[in-house]
Amino acid sequence: MQKGIKFRIYPNREQKNFIHQTLRCCRFIYNRGLAMRKEGYENGEKIGYSQTSAMLTELKKQEEFAVLKAADSIALQQSLRDLDRGFVNFFQKRASYPTFKSKHNRFQSYRTVNQKDNIRIVGRYIKLPKLGFVKIRQSMEVEKINHVIIEHTPAGKYFAVLNVDFEPEPRSNAGGTIGIDVGIKAFYSDSNGNTVSNPRYLERSMRKLIREQRRLSRKQKDSHNREKQRIRVAGVYEKVTNQRNDFLQKQSTMLV
């Protein structure tokens, strides 16, 4: 089995510039491939991954698109594979028609694949294609990395989501059942008489988020102070999301 492990990374200024350049290139290639496939779909012409990949190769030969040659080539190919997967899901009625990616989306990411051990953790750093060694806050050991998703969040933080193989630990099945009643005052009560309260730290974070959102609404539009406040709101929102997910994960694990 595979799982994703998320670590925060701390790229330097040069590495940040490269990450954002790769994000722009991946978005451009994805949108270019989508436009190509959309036109072919409307004209009854079958265009798949191989045709969009050939389009990328031709663009790299043109001086106008020289920036594509400097970006992570694996990440560019992966963006086209994501597009192809989107069309497969659409035709199998598992998803809606793929849409163009906007540069105004605050959350951006790209995926790169481990080839010939070009992605690995060495000490307090992770080696990434074209980026070199990037400082990482590693909270657990990992073995072979299959691929990595580099994320830039609305709060201005950078993360590396590592896809790794793992063997799940077998769990004993007691064979029992339990009833759960989700409430408002308490998070839930079960049929054994146990009650789990809503976490107070999450309530405090929610109140802080509301305060910061009110401050944001009072800032002048397009001002520097508004952008600073937007990042502050995004940071609090990210904290609330992480706290909620951590709480739910712990409760579900305890019940199982």
Task: For the regions a language model picked out, list residue spans one by one.
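Nucleic-acid substrate recognition interfaces
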Residues: 1-256
